[in-house]
UniProtKB/Swiss-Prot annotation:
Residues annotated for Mg(2+) 1 binding in this entry: D258, E271
Record carries keyword Cytoplasm: yes
InterPro entries per the UniProt record, alphabetical: ATP-grasp (IPR011761), ATP_grasp_subdomain_1 (IPR013815), D-Ala_lig_Van_CS (IPR000291), D_ala_D_ala (IPR005905), Dala_Dala_lig_C (IPR011095), Dala_Dala_lig_N (IPR011127), PreATP-grasp_dom_sf (IPR016185)
GO process terms (BP): cell wall organization; peptidoglycan biosynthetic process; regulation of cell shape
Localization: Cytoplasm
Ranges where the ATP-grasp domain occurs: 105-304
GO MF terms, alphabetically ordered: ATP binding; D-alanine-D-alanine ligase activity; metal ion binding
Protein task: Cell wall formation.
Protein name, entry field: D-alanine--D-alanine ligase
Class of enzymatic activity (EC top level): ligase
GO cellular component terms, A-Z: cytosol
């Protein structure tokens, strides 16, 4: 068996999803980190070269840093399984499932794990939407989001029943399934998992009302506190919850799980990122750094976990 450093490694980056730019940035950082440690790593953009040809081109392993649809939704993973190349991150089923926020949440709910109360709307049911009834059940404000778009695209905070319809219509432009969720007014945090190690939680403090695309990728005024201050008991509770959430959907390798707290301080699971960002702004490397992983060593560890 060749050692990892003797293998030709493809770093999959770019792609065609709305998060292409983020993936190009993450990919460049990962590529540098691998090359600086003596790996034979090469950038491959599926936009320019079919992933199905990787084996013919002599590649032996894949570091997947594609974000969003086409890269994080099981499609690429299926191609890699088909041609028999080991790759980083989650497998086909988990990647497909976690791309769909609604189905992920239903699964967690089935396992008895805490999620936000929500109403599910489809293109068909949107026609008979009853804003007053939804507000009566879930209260105000509400969060409206497409089920399958990443990077906070298509999100709206709704403050009154009469604005619900237009928020749903906006979200339906990005997906056929839309979630209307109770507003969680507590803290926003994200917890990375590396192999079977839960890394310190990062608290996200956006300057606006919630963590949108601007706060994620552009603004320098979003504050990140890592590790997030909490008691040991509270951290144990969060760590166990994240581990159960990770295992319930079948994650492997690495993932990042977003969590919020409600007005009473109870944790609620939000979503899973199976290919977290790896840019200078990204939260996974920020968290890993607090327990001694340099960016280079983190990238190497993710590669070592590839199957």
């Amino acid at each position: 068996m060749k050692s990892l450093k003797q293998q030709k490694i493809a770093v999959l980056l770019g792609g065609t999803a709305s998060e292409r730019e983020v993936s190009l940035n993450s990919g460049a950082a990962v590529l540098d980190a691998l090359r600086s440690q003596g790996y034979d790593a090469h950038p491959v953009d599926p936009k320019d070269m079919p992933v199905a040809d990787l084996k013919q081109q002599g590649f032996e392993r894949v570091f997947n840093i594609l974000h969003g649809r086409g890269g994080e939704d099981g499609v690429i993973q299926g191609v890699l399984e088909q041609i028999g190349l080991p790759y980083t991150g989650c497998g086909v089923m988990t990647s497909a499932l976690t791309m769909d926020k609604m189905r992920t949440k239903m699964l967690w709910k089935g396992f008895g794990l805490p999620i936000a109360d929500m109403e599910i709307v489809t293109k068909n049911t949107a026609l008979s939407l009853e804003p007053q009834a939804i507000v009566a059940r879930l209260g105000l404000p509400l969060m409206v989001k497409p089920s399958r778009e990443g990077s906070s695209v298509g999100l709206t905070k709704v403050d009154s029943a009469d604005k619900l319809k237009s928020a749903v219509d906006l979200a339906l432009k990005f997906d056929d399934i839309v979630l209307i969720e109770e507003w969680l007014s507590g803290d926003e945090l994200t917890v990375p998992v590396l192999g079977d190690e839960v890394l310190p939680a990062v608290q996200i403090v956006p300057e606006g009302e919630f963590y949108d695309y601007n706060a994620k990728y552009i603004s320098d005024n979003t504050r990140y506190i890592c590790p997030m201050p909490m008691s040991d008991e509270r951290w144990d509770e969060l760590k166990n919850l994240v581990k159960r959430a990770y295992e319930a959907v079948g994650c492997r390798g690495w993932s990042r799980i977003d969590v919020m707290t409600d007005s009473e301080g109870n944790f609620r699971l939000i979503e899973v990122n199976t290919t977290p960002g790896m840019t200078s702004h990204s939260l996974f490397p920020k968290s890993a750094a607090t327990v001694g992983y340099s960016f280079e060593k983190l990238v190497e560890k993710i590669l070592e976990l590839s199957v």
